[in-house]
Amino acid sequence: GVIALEESSVMLGEVVVKADLPATRLTGNVMVTTVAGSVLSKAGTANDVLAKIPLVTGGDGNFKVFGRGAPVIYINGRKVTDASSLEQLSSEDIKSVEVISNPGPQYPADVNAVIRIKTLPPKGEGFSLSAYSNTMLATFARNSENLDLKYRVGGLEVFANGYFYGGKWRFHDISALTTYGPQVFDQQVEAYTTPVSRNLYGKLGFNYQAGQNHSFGAYYQAGKSRVSLKGTVDTRVTSDGAPYESLWQWNDGDETELPDHNANVYYNGSFGKLSVDFNGDFLQTETSKSSTKVETGGLAPDQVVLTDAVNRSRMWAEKLVLSYPLWKGSIEVGEEFTDSRVSYNSVYHGAGISGGDTEIKESGIAAFAEMSQSFGPVQLGVGLRYEHVRYRYFEGGMLDNDLSRTYDNWFPSLTASAQAGQVGLSFNFTSRTRRPSYRQLDGTVEYINRYSYQAGNPALKPTRMYTAQLMAQWRYFFAQAIYNHENNSVFYTTERYENDPLVKLVIFENVPLYRQFQFAVGAQPTVGCWSTQPTVGIFCSFYTTEFLGREKRLDKPFLYLNWSNTVTLPKGWTVDADFMAQTAGHGQNCYIKATSYLNIGVSKRFFNDSFSVKLEARDIFDTANERVTMYNGDILVSTANYQGSRNLRLTLRYRLNASRSKYRGTGAGSSEKDRL
């Protein structure tokens, strides 16, 4: 959409052009999209808004920034820890969305991209209610319900939220695993899985505004979920092209998350020119898993494999940030502390593996500083982050000194931006690290079927990343180029288990060098009632591996097109059409086949926008599927995952005296929550 503004020169260092200023503008190294007052404000929820932001794709809480992977998402500085938070936030409450493709020192060193959602200032007092219901129909039906209540009087706000999600869906996965050696073994695997999910979450909190300069508050959130899975796996094995063995497996599993606990306390205020932001967080989860796998056929006797597993995690975190005006800009300093522990316990009956008993304890402290200065149309910024991490790995209750480590790292950053006429330019460089997730570090071998096991790798090293980014904007056109250099990047791979050519172990490994380059250009014009946003890009990765004794270069680029369209009609009608297409190309040690989707939606608003109805058809041609071929030494793995992405959706939303939350807690330990 187009925001009508008067002609202005530089404002707060942002790229500001004339009255045809588009919804998205370049501010330093941040792409800022204005939602309030644009067609995006009528999109529905935060999920619907993010799907239309430049360089962002995805939906239902699972988003990717072009070439950067999954971002960390914040709402008013508070990290989003579950997808329901985006579904609960109405697009009419959103002021702007900021996309940072190369975050600076104020964010943990393992964060590749950040999306910051800012809401409009709260207004009004008294009681308010917001409710929605979303029904999705694919092979089966799924439903989500949300109720949001607030009460305000004076500087006090009390809020409560309830969220339910449940339903049934179906996965269809096809795999081919070929092992080359004296004999060529080929395994064709076809699996059908039907999960049934029920999730219930509740949240209660308060916020108090003490005058103009101080606010504090707290919230507590608890939830419980259960997923039941039933399915079949049909495996056919050939040796040098001749039939060798056939195996059929029936699965019945259950995964229950005991009531998890998530709490936050915060203080936000100012003392003269000094701004203070403090947050403390606690997170605790426990998940129990049980499964029964019945395997018949094949050369080995029939068998029944029983699995019982429990995963527990706990985290404490706090973060303090101080900012102060300095000369022609400002300086920001802060520290962050996290203390986490994760345990994995599993027992197998009837399988050739015994399970495991592992525990990981990790504590870390970080300090960071960033200074920015303005010199006319030019802005310069420098930053530095220091992280000290102590990692301890326990097996069977005993400390493994060989797998325990201590890290001390410095991460510098540099930012420069300028405006030359109607052209805005920005350059930034960062040095970061990405530590493996706790699941990637868990060495317990997990049983999938007679021929397939899965495990983490406790010997994994952190990935060191160096990233340079150049961005530009002219009127409603924008462009971005990023180069990324990684040492010790973590790849998925497959290897023989105990040298058995038929049994595969899916595991993670470090690779010495992995490089990426990406370039994208797009526009956001508006013609009458039609707002359109085409973006085209190219993504290249550079990696060389060994396959079948020969060097294999994996450097075929992806071509990318994302085209969002909104037509605003009289009497509250809106029509949306979004198209995405990506050609085949290489990424890491994989060849990823082409994928695409087309979504069309129609919405209508009633009663002064207090009630709305939206009907959507997602992935109309059922082409948003994942098809990947992975190269691993003498093993070739091809997979095709059909997730049932084609569906119909009906969303109803009602708002009574709707008001925005004053809660200003930003959260601590955001990166650690993701790893947990």
Tell me what each language-model feature is.
Residues 2-5, 18, 46-49, 83-84, ...:
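N-terminal periplasmic accessory domains that precede
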Residues 2-39, 59-60, 68, 100-102:
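Short, acidic, small-residue-rich periplasmic hinge/interaction motif at the N-terminus
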Residues 47-79:
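Extracytoplasmic beta-strand/coil segments of soluble accessory domains associated
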Residues 78-104:
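Short acidic/polar hinge/loop motifs at secondary-structure boundaries
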Residues 108-115, 123-173, 197-200:
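Outer-membrane beta-barrel translocator/receptor signature
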Residues 118-131, 172-176, 188, 200-204, ...:
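Surface-exposed extracellular loop regions of Gram-negative outer-membrane beta-barrel proteins
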Residues 201-225, 251-396, 419, 423-424, ...:
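Face-selective signature of the C-terminal outer-membrane beta-barrel domain
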Residues 359-362, 402-405, 433-487, 504-518, ...:
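Outer-membrane beta-barrel signature, preferentially recognizing the C-terminal barrel domain
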